[in-house]
Amino acid sequence: MVLLVVDTQKLITTTDLYNFNAFENAVKTLIAAARENNVEVIYVRHDDGVGAELTKGTPGFEIYEGFSPWSGEKIFDKTVNSSFKGTGLLEYLKAKNVHTVAVVGLQTDYCIDATIKCGFEHGFKMIVPENANSTFDNAFMIGEQSYKYYNEFMWKGRYAECVSVEETIKRMKG
């Protein structure tokens, strides 16, 4: 198992996210548990390209302080929603013989959704810990509705196993 921390960058990791405090706590808890149990923590950052607010070289591009990578932890950069497309992540995980990926981060309805579905299609067992992904309100639904739609309906039993933080930690321990 690996813990994949997706797009938890300063620009978008804000208190405007749905259920921010629970999200922040869940992600911090899972990162700490992964490290304690020798589960590799891998980060992914999104780059919208030159001139965008979310691009390499801007302050908002860096990982949120509360989730900072340790020296030596892998960081993959992407330019599309899926963490697997053109990043080297797929090849890295296959080379390490990884079968299970626990996914946390942002945003539920964009990069988390794409990463879970693509990971599933690449043959990985995808784990989604409760409250460890979030999103913002949008023109069609509030963040809470997006969160519940994906976590409780779309992914569960189709593309991923949606479990509690405690269950995820139990699995990290083997």
Q: What is each of the regions a protein language model found here?
A:
Residues 48-52:
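Glycine-rich, proline-tolerant flexible connector loops at the mouths of alpha/beta enzymes
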Residues 15-17, 53-55:
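Short, glycine/acidic-enriched capping/hinge loops at junctions between secondary-structure elements
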Residues 2, 28-35, 54-174:
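Active-site-adjacent betaalpha module
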Residues 1-7:
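Short coil-to-beta-strand
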Residues 16-43, 47:
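A short alpha/beta connector and helix-capping loop motif
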Residues 9-15:
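Short acidic, Gly/Ser-rich segments with clustered Asp/Glu that frequently serve as metal-coordination loops
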